[in-house]
């Protein structure tokens, strides 16, 4: 239990040197943190930490491990809107922070670049782009629901199945349409 917490918190605090040390000591990059119910790779992806994601993947992190909700790494990568929408929502003040599940991470200009770099790494590592959560949602469902155009495009270009129904009998297209309608209604 203590070992899984050490690696998780090293990733969570984005302490790259400690992550490397722990991985070199044989800490399991696939261990689920029973306290937060997250996997170190999921935390690195959520915080858009490219370097720690690389270290975890090169040390045996499985890109298809699910958390307690059945979410995979692509689900987590899809949960945030793309940078232009985040800037609009947060009014892009200097030093703006975005919620990183249990922490806040700085909203950086290279947010989308990091997102795509991590997405490519995960795809190369054979992460399943059509993995369904316990609610039947694929990463494309989530990216569509959150209006994450960057990830929607990424998934579609790589053959994501647009016909998978979630537990509400919705396809990703339904969520994309609803997302556009919500944005339209906010203007009025």
From Swiss-Prot:
One Pfam family cited in the UniProt record for this chain: Ank_5
Listed SMART domains: ANK (SM00248)
ANK repeat feature ranges: 2-31, 36-65, 135-164, 168-187
InterPro entries, A to Z: Ankyrin_rpt (IPR002110), Ankyrin_rpt-contain_sf (IPR036770), NF-kappa-B_inhibitor (IPR051070)
Superkingdom, natural source: Viruses
Keyword annotations: ANK repeat, Repeat
Molecular functions (GO terms): NF-kappaB binding
rRNA-binding keyword on record: no
Annotated protein name in UniProt: Putative ankyrin repeat protein FPV230
Organism, scientific name: Fowlpox virus (strain NVSL)
